Curated annotation (Swiss-Prot):
This is UPF0060 membrane protein Mvan_3406. It holds the Pfam family UPF0060. It comes from Mycolicibacterium vanbaalenii (strain DSM 7251 / JCM 13017 / BCRC 16820 / KCTC 9966 / NRRL B-24157 / PYR-1). NCBIfam families: PRK02237.1. GO terms for cellular component: plasma membrane. It is a multi-pass membrane protein. Disulfide bonds: none annotated. The keyword Nuclease does not apply. InterPro entries: UPF0060. It is found in: Cell membrane.
């Protein structure tokens, strides 16, 4: 269950962050409507991913995904835009990922 859940979180992050990045590129970097359209499709696909999480509670899944989004966004910036996170960015992302672990995988 943990592996499936973690893989779904990674897929969700790629779709959401990637989709938002594509829209950003299309609008802010003037790359055009093709980029925007691809971003909108990716963002729409992201909306379906949470439904496949093994946990049945929408609020829990989306709350935990927020932590993945924080860390994933920083990583995306490093890979795609040459962003260099500082120690506070990294510490904050680590705290968020610890929260993901507690919310999703703590024994109940």
């Amino acid at each position: 269950m943990v592996v499936k859940s973690a893989l779904l979180f990674v897929l969700a992050a790629i779709l959401e962050i990637g989709g938002a990045w594509l829209v950003w590129q299309g609008v802010r970097e003037h790359r055009g409507l093709t980029w925007v359209g691809a971003g909108v499709i990716a963002l729409g696909a992201y909306g379906f991913v949470a439904a496949f999480q093994p946990d049945a509670h929408f609020g829990r899944v989306l709350a935990a995904y927020g932590g993945v989004f924080v860390a994933g966004s920083l990583l995306w910036g490093v890979v795609a835009d040459g962003f260099r996170p500082d120690r506070w960015d990294i510490t904050g992302a680590a705290v968020c990922l610890a929260g993901v672990g507690l919310i999703m995988y703590a024994p109940r």
